[in-house]
Amino acid sequence: LTVCIHYTMSISRQNLSILIVTLKSENVIHQCIKSINKDMPIIVVENSSNSKFKEDLEKKYTNVKCTLSFKNLGMGSGNNLGIKLSSTDYVLILNPDVILETNTIDEIILAFKTIQDFAILAPILADKNYPNYQLDQNNEFSIQTEKAFKVKNVDGFAMLLNKKKLENILSKETSNDEQNYFDENFFMYLENDDLCKRVINNGGNIYVVPKAKINHLAAKSVDQKFADEVEFSRNWHWIWSKFYFNKKHFGFLKAFVEGFPRFFLSIFKYLFFLLINNKTKKKIYFNRASGFYNATIGKPSWYRPNFNE
């Protein structure tokens, strides 16, 4: 006679860490940290060698431990590093420009009592005009409820990972390069979409908790004095990541057919802004074309923003 006992670790303040990946985020991260309960451990992965940033954070906040990566790892790799450093079963990933409401964590803990089978759980944006999730086709009216409901995808700026559940789900994958939580081939954009799709494809569940609300400043993670450089980087990586995501999950042909019109339009706009000598727009559309070209020939996501002051 074999008796199987299933143990489920519950979410509590002691069993939940906050993870924030940063780069040039000094101007916004303090709002984020101050919105988090002081008794909760916070892991900050700073994608640079900025020791002053680390010292200032750890001096000001006793619940913060900052790790320097010494180079810009990007979001996926930075999150993987932070998750590996965490000692809790649950990790809430936040962008530094996210602000929790007073009861956000409490509502997440309460929701756990009714949905223990989740791999990923997400709070919801307080502004209902900008949903941070995509619904399943059969669940289109779930937004009407206050109860947690299943979705097929959540945005990466606020997502709670059930580490043990994810490890079990992702162990079904055979590709050696996918043993991390996030696929590190993504430097920026769609690493969260990729993780969500892998979870769903392998039988996992993703939920949104409507009572757990957050505010997102949106595109404010990096100091605004680097706005142009951030914009150049975003345009390169969005096109590269979109092609890579589609190729990975749907094949090269779909990725090419969907991406080529953007590539052609980017070339046209690049030439136009070259003629009228608009350097910023010229660079944006050059980067879009470059991102597509590099993705099609199989080059890695190599572009890095230049933040030299």
Residue ranges and their predicted role:
Residues 179-180, 184-187, 193-215:
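Catalytic donor-sugar/metal-binding loop of nucleotide-sugar-dependent glycosyltransferases
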Residues 19-38:
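Short, well-formed alpha-helical segments that are part of the catalytic scaffolds
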Residues 40-49, 67-69:
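Short beta-strand/loop segment that forms part of the nucleotide-sugar
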Residues 35, 46-54:
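A conserved acidic beta->alpha catalytic loop
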Residues 57-77, 83-85:
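Conserved donor nucleotide-binding strand/loop of the catalytic core
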Residues 73, 77, 81, 98-188, ...:
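Acidic/His-rich active-site region of diverse nucleotide-sugar glycosyltransferases
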Residues 233, 237-240, 252-309:
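Non-catalytic, C-terminal membrane-associated alpha-helical segments of glycosyltransferases
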Residues 91:
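Short aromatic/hydrophobic "clamp" motif used to bind/position activated sugar donors
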